[in-house]
């Protein structure tokens, strides 16, 4: 029994494999589950179980993703692997599978390839905080100097996109040989697991972050004041604390005078809970859906940001035609739509359905945002794209 209890208290970390097609991402995923299951318990997953990834929908977008789990002595990992390049792009932009760290797989036989670069860039844009490199197929390269060269190229590429290339762990291995049980190579999988444990810090839990609640509804209760409802996204709000109302209009301060859940009064509302928050001295018309309630000073409203977006294909129910500069859709953040205009990168005239692209967005009203916030692009209530705030500008 004691073992079960211990399992549940292990920190939970989300990771995934990224890298160029056919460099061995799925084979590595299978090798990790197989080797770690033998070493530390858990269940092995075969290559074809992982490769045959089920379809799932995230924000109306179809993505093929495989989810596997494995344990090290100190942590529990949830790991995502995607069969196709397009699935990676969609996954990273929608945040369907948020990664605390990524394992970049680079075949020693090829070195860095176009998708290697694209996945590193995407990782930077969507806020993947840590990358570890697994140089795969090293059993097929006899020349030590060639291995050195590939490693150097990968490190330079990481540094180019503001990852610490010189300090990144690089493990040289062979996923296939490890999967076949060759001990020299299974040791490299254990080494990779140890690098995950030591290099990726334990993610901060939502409850430890500053309080934020996206406002879904506003009511006025006679004799008591104004109540806003929503699901607490992060942090804790306690009765008696000062909070800010941020977004759409000028930021205002107010005090939380009550928290209720299912008509019961509570002392506080915590991350993940659906609550009503009573606000002192706030008028019904001062607050609206689309604003957020937040710890004072923790989040600011912005109208201009750089984003990475994926435009749905026609088959996904997206647009049938491209759009051009001057396109004015709605941008759906958390609970509301705000109209905005777009600026396309230099030299890009139009964007086709199915493309992913970097664009600068200018909203007509400010929204509470940080880098990493996800949004949908909509036309008349229909989702035509998904995006992530890469960098707030103004």
Curated annotation (Swiss-Prot):
**Could you tell me which cysteines form disulfide bridges?**
none
Query: What PANTHER family does the record point to?
Result: ELONGATION FACTOR TU, MITOCHONDRIAL (PTHR43721:SF22), ELONGATION FACTOR TU-RELATED (PTHR43721)
Residues of the region (G4) are: 136-139
- Chain's gene name: tuf1
Q: How does it assemble?
A: Monomer.
Would the keyword Protein biosynthesis turn up in this protein's UniProt record? yes
Q: Where is this region: G2?
A: 60-64
Record protein name field: Elongation factor Tu
One Pfam entry name: GTP_EFTU_D3
